From Swiss-Prot:
It is found in: Secreted; Endoplasmic reticulum. Residues 1-20 form the signal peptide. Required for MUC2 post-transcriptional synthesis and secretion. May play a role in the production of mucus by intestinal cells. Proto-oncogene that may play a role in cell migration, cell differentiation and cell growth. Promotes cell adhesion. This is Anterior gradient protein 2 homolog. The lineage of its organism: Eukaryota, Metazoa, Chordata, Craniata, Vertebrata. PANTHER family: ANTERIOR GRADIENT PROTEIN 2 HOMOLOG, ANTERIOR GRADIENT PROTEIN-RELATED.
Amino acid sequence: MEKFSVSAILLLVAISGTLAKDTTVKSGAKKDPKDSRPKLPQTLSRGWGDQLIWTQTYEEALYRSKTSNRPLMVIHHLDECPHSQALKKVFAEHKEIQKLAEQFVLLNLVYETTDKHLSPDGQYVPRIVFVDPSLTVRADITGRYSNRLYAYEPSDTALLYDNMKKALKLLKTEL
């Protein structure tokens, strides 16, 4: 019986030692800053403005735009793209852009849609395209580049803001 008790105690000590992991950082070891921050759940905003209302799919966004008579702003981006990340940071922190964005149906995509009208000059990121409630892509609202018409950089916030105001002036659908 005594042998059994000693064996059981040794087994419990071994198991508890294995299960208890050292969570402290040893001196000289660097702690990864990504590990110190808790992973936030992914939302539809993907960091472009958590207080804004975002749509989940392109089809839903088109429907909401048409029924609410508000223009649609489609932001194409990639999580791994440094240009997309820089534009996202500026977009999310720019108070006037965030306020104006409330008047749009918003969609941000990390994948391409089957609608080729959203990529008239190629599939690149970041790219922002405006769609009128009449479901017409606003080809007249472009960025500052002639080879990437719908590209914006963090320094283009004034142009983006002006283009958002232009997009709010809806196309006339009268016959």
